[in-house]
């Protein structure tokens, strides 16, 4: 049973008097603002986070999803980068995958620079695993995507026909891999998946933010959803575009943006935030969470007829509109009010009615 916070008893995690709840015994907090390892999406599409009070022995309720399992098994970033980069050096890019990347707007030079590779066949994977383990001297089961299969052999995850998209950190290292499957449709599974060993008892890739290769200043940068989308937009626009793994995965940006010394962040999320409540709420929560770590948060929008994503509108060389200050918050508030039954983040209402800073 959950009890709503109030002005007389605010949330012990974020300190606010609304939107959050506590368990009846006060030991577990359901905070709508401050991320934790355990999260869930409620019926309205809002993500909330579970926190234990102090050293409470009360277990986290079983229905909550662990946000970042596998931490204890995951190798340090420098080891993961060593393995993934060695793996990618051993792979090639098939012509059909090269054609797909060209169709998206990337030049041959950019395709080579960014390092996309076709995923190996199941027969090749065993040989690659043996080669990497013998050459690098690394326990590959600590690397997301590698696992011991039912035949007691090292194996590498991924579908039968896909290509790998490097997820890079601020040093340009490959710290994770996203796979784009060739097949689509309900029977084929998701189009994009991250390489993970979680279902085999190994590590997941964890919270991720992709930083596309870019040589210029990043004091002003954009953020969107999707690695390949960010790569294409960075290449075509000539400006840095960071990538969240989904519309609500802002956790990594909270620490990354200050490290990069980003002053102005422009949210350039998919055009369907106008019609998809989950995308809209993710966008609103991202803006609210990140406004405290940068000087300014702005929003970039465009005519949906030009394309869904920032990469589409960049390829089309279409017009984009920048919403700044109070105008940006009012845009989000107005869209939230248009969804029946959607619970708007209280902080958003405050920002839209203030000067927007």
Show where each model-derived region lies.
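Non-catalytic accessory segments of DNA primases and related replication-initiation nucleases
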Residues: 1-157, 162, 184-198, 250, ...
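TOPRIM fold recognition
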Residues: 7-12, 20, 30, 218-222, ...
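Residue-level marker of positions within ordered structural domains that often coincide
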Residues: 16, 36, 106-107, 170, ...
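Non-catalytic surface loops within mature trypsin-like serine protease
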Residues: 35, 169, 181, 271, ...
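Short, charged/polar, Gly/Pro-enriched secondary-structure boundary elements
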Residues: 37-41, 174, 319-321
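Short flexible/disordered coil segments
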Residues: 49-54, 181-182, 332-340
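Phosphate-handling DNA/RNA-contact segment within nucleic-acid enzymes
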Residues: 67-71, 126-263
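N-terminal, helix-rich and Lys/Arg-enriched segments in bacterial and organellar proteins
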Residues: 110-123, 127, 167, 300, ...
